[in-house]
């Protein structure tokens, strides 16, 4: 029934709640419809749906861990004027993390968008990561050090810790700008926490994740 509701709001071009945290069960685990896959050789961070007094949030906490948390979309999101909007806060960042260094490239939370082939762990899809960084310059971005099919954009950093931050991005426009080609459909969205490089502690919360069409 919840999947049917998601399909309906996507079709009607009204905000689509991709988390549905309000109806999620409090306690450890992910909201319904979401999956987890640990980065190879790593344990997944701990997840918990909590109520912070203003509503339900998903808390992600780990140290020396890394995993993908994702929701595959059906139907896929075709190119449009839509935007992805979310609200998050970071309570603890891994010490010495730096997006500019391969050996220090950790983040307390990244929100990512998968374009193309839905098998997001294969080699066909392209992924944009909207990342909570550290002390890198505002607006810092680059191709991933792992693959040119992955692209990382810093949208917040160390000065934004402990505060709820609202973000809104246009993934299709970013895709065109980055890869200079027509974007395929969006097949999945997800969040990620990785502290496997620095082995530091990280704690982050996300309250809302929506697809909005004006």
Q: Can you say where each PLM-predicted feature lies in the sequence?
A:
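Hydrophobic h-region of N-terminal signal peptides that target proteins for export
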Residues: 4-16
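Extracellular ligand-binding interfaces
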Residues: 91-160, 200-205
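Short carbohydrate-recognition loop motifs
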Residues: 45-68
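Extracellular beta-strand elements of beta-rich domains used
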Residues: 21, 189, 207-211
């Amino acid at each position: 029934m919840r999947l049917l509701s998601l399909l309906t709001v996507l079709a009607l071009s009204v905000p689509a709640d991709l988390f549905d945290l309000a109806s999620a069960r409090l306690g450890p685990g992910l909201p319904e419809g979401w999956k987890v896959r640990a980065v190879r050789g790593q344990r997944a961070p701990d997840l918990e749906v909590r109520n912070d007094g203003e509503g339900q949030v998903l808390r992600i906490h780990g140290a020396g861990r890394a995993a993908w948390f994702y929701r595959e979309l059906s139907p896929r999101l075709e190119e449009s004027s839509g935007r992805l909007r979310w609200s998050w806060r970071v309570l603890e960042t891994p010490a010495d993390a730096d997006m500019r260094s391969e050996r220090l490239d950790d983040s307390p939370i990244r929100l990512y968008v998968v374009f193309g082939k839905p098998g997001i762990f294969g080699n066909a899809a392209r992924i944009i990561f909207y990342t909570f960084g550290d002390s890198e310059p505002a607006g810092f971005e680059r191709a991933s050090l792992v693959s040119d099919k992955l692209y990382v954009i810093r949208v917040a950093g160390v000065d934004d810790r402990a505060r709820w931050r609202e973000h809104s991005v246009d993934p299709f426009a970013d895709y065109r700008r980055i890869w200079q080609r027509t974007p395929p459909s969006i097949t999945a969205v997800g969040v990620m926490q990785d502290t496997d490089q620095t082995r530091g502690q990280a704690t982050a919360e996300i309250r809302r994740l929506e697809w909005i069409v004006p």
